[in-house]
Structure formats: structure tokens, C-alpha cells
């Protein structure tokens, strides 16, 4: 039977796929942290708060066109949550991409507080 966490991730996933920044922001805490899959070591680029999220999506639309997430699954291991997914699209150079990824999540007060992202690196 679905519960509040399932509903949260269903809303979050739909909003993410549509790049609906305000709906995504409604699913995360005010102090939300997103550790991107690229950037400076060790954590990659770290976005902080809803404003960091909004700024990323305004830039991301220029970097990745037609990004589409599929095969998304949420998995629970005790109090830990992780999501697996496939993302396809076109990068900033116009080259198509197709990758699998995983996100590690922390939940606080019924919202997503941390999204730590990892993608397969394909040559």
C-alpha cells in the first residue's frame, strides 16, 4: 500500500521529468542539498536550498536538451532511500546520451533534504 514517502517520490519524479521547478521545490526542504554527479571533488557541485535548485534548472535547460528520465524505481533499506533510473537526452554539444544512475536520499519532515546523485560514465 502506498504511503506518504511513495506519494512524495511520485510527485517529485513527475515534476523532475517535466522540469517543473516549483513543484520540485515543493517536495524538498528549505535547506535541501543536491550533490550533483559532476564537479569538484569529493562531493561534486553542491546546490543548496530551493534557490540553488531553481538556478540549476535555469542553467540546465541550456546544457541538456530533451532530458527524459525512465525506469525510475525507489528502494528502501531501513531509513535509507535510494532511487535508480535511466536518463536519455542530448548534451550541450548536441550528442545523444543514455545512462543509468542512482540517487541516495535523506528525508526530513516529510520532504527530501538530500539528493546525492551518481551516473554511469560511458566512453
Predicted feature residues:
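Generic N-terminal helix/loop capping motif
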Residues: 15, 31, 35, 60-63
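Short, low-complexity N-terminal intrinsically disordered segments enriched in polar/charged residues
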Residues: 1-31
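A beta-strand edge to alpha-helix "cap/lid" segment located at domain peripheries
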Residues: 4, 20, 41, 48, ...
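A short gly/proline-enriched turn/hairpin at secondary-structure junctions
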Residues: 33-46
Amino acid at each position: 500500500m502506498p504511503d506518504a514517502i511513495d506519494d512524495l517520490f511520485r510527485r517529485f519524479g513527475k515534476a523532475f521529468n517535466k522540469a517543473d521547478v516549483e513543484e520540485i521545490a515543493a517536495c524538498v526542504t528549505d535547506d535541501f542539498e543536491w550533490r550533483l554527479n559532476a564537479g569538484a571533488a569529493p562531493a561534486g557541485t553542491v546546490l543548496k536550498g530551493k534557490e540553488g535548485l531553481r538556478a540549476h534548472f535555469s542553467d540546465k535547460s541550456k546544457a541538456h536538451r530533451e532530458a527524459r528520465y525512465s525506469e525510475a524505481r525507489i528502494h528502501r533499506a531501513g531509513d535509507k532511500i535510494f532511487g535508480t533510473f535511466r536518463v536519455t537526452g542530448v548534451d550541450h554539444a548536441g550528442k545523444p546520451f543514455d545512462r543509468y544512475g542512482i540517487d541516495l536520499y535523506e528525508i526530513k519532515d516529510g520532504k527530501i533534504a538530500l539528493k546525492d546523485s551518481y551516473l554511469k560514465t560511458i566512453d
